């Protein structure tokens, strides 16, 4: 077995954490020029991943150490969400905006972030973030709020292939939210509930509308909520693995995105893959981490 799937804090998953040095001299040096990267003048870069349902940010220093991270819900306007997370992460880090020598954006809303210096695709950023966390990773499954993607990496961490499902919400976090609402269960409770399942129930449709009708029918048949939840997770896993097969099921699996926090989905995926999934301490920040790493490459 390559690795265990137990979630740990970001630093225990390979991201060293350091307290930011916030002296005025260091602020000035870091803001003046990229060459300020030295032992006496810390450099800070920020990566921001503007997704459909969450906006995530990471600040690293010149030693690739994690200074701070943040995750918030994306509102109606991605630009406003970006401003909110900028304020939050700077407060966490004890830094000022002027301390950030580079800001790189990624995700669907990356071009709507006015304070970003440049933007990079989420595929590239997920690949870089995943390889940084664990160089053994070869196949990434990312399930977000409204899309899912599979990415293949080579031993150097380069993206060699990828596929995306962004045409509908089937098998995504939004799909899970709809099913949880139909079951009258909190989305945060759905995964744990499904682990109590004792009967395999098949959900034949991944279309949100038809799947909801199936779930309502199963409720009318007095099926256990835990069994229905397990059936929903089985359907999501089947769709996800079908996506992964298109880039090649090479062992060294990693799952990112908000759905990686659902233990029911993770369990079913591992059973069907017959292998463990590597899940970082905060699976939603992998794209932002990759963006920050790209930022460091630009200035160091």
Language-model region placement:
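N-terminal glycine/serine-rich phosphate-binding loop of ATP-dependent small-molecule kinases
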Residues: 1-122, 261, 270-271, 275-277
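Active-site nucleophile and cofactor-binding loops and adjacent substrate-binding regions
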Residues: 73-74, 118-127, 141-145, 163-171, ...
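Internal, active-site/partner-interface "lid" segment
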Residues: 186-218
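Adenine-nucleotide phosphate-binding core of ATP-dependent small-molecule kinases
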Residues: 211-244, 284
């Amino acid at each position: 077995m390559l690795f265990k799937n137990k979630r740990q804090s970001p630093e225990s998953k390979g991201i060293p954490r350091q307290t930011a040095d916030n002296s005025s001299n260091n602020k000035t040096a870091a803001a003046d020029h990229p060459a300020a990267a030295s032992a006496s003048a810390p450099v800070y870069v920020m990566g921001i991943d503007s997704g459909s349902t969450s906006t995530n940010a990471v600040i690293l220093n010149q030693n690739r150490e994690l200074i701070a991270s943040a995750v918030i819900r994306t509102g109606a306007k991605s630009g406003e969400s970006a401003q909110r997370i900028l304020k939050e992460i700077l407060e966490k880090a004890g830094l000022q905006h002027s301390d950030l020598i580079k800001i790189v954006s990624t995700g669907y809303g990356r071009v709507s972030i006015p304070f970003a210096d440049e933007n990079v695709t989420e595929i590239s950023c997920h690949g870089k973030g995943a390889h940084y966390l664990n160089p053994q990773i070869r196949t990434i499954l990312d399930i977000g709020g409204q899309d899912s993607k599979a990415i293949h990496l080579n031993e150097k961490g380069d993206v060699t292939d990828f596929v995306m499902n962004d045409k509908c919400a089937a098998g995504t976090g939004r799909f899970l939210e709809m099913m949880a609402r139909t079951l009258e269960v909190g989305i945060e409770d759905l995964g744990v509930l499904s682990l109590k399942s004792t009967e395999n129930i098949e959900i034949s449709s991944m279309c949100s509308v038809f799947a909801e009708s199936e779930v309502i029918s199963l409720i009318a048949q007095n099926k256990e909520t835990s069994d229905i939840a397990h059936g929903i997770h089985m359907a999501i896993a089947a769709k996800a693995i079908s996506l992964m097969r298109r880039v090649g099921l090479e062992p060294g699996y990693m799952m990112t995105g908000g759905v990686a926090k659902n233990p029911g989905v993770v369990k079913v995926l591992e059973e069907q893959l017959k292998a463990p999934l590597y899940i970082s301490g905060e699976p939603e920040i992998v794209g932002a981490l990759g963006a920050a790493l790209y930022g460091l490459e630009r200035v160091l």
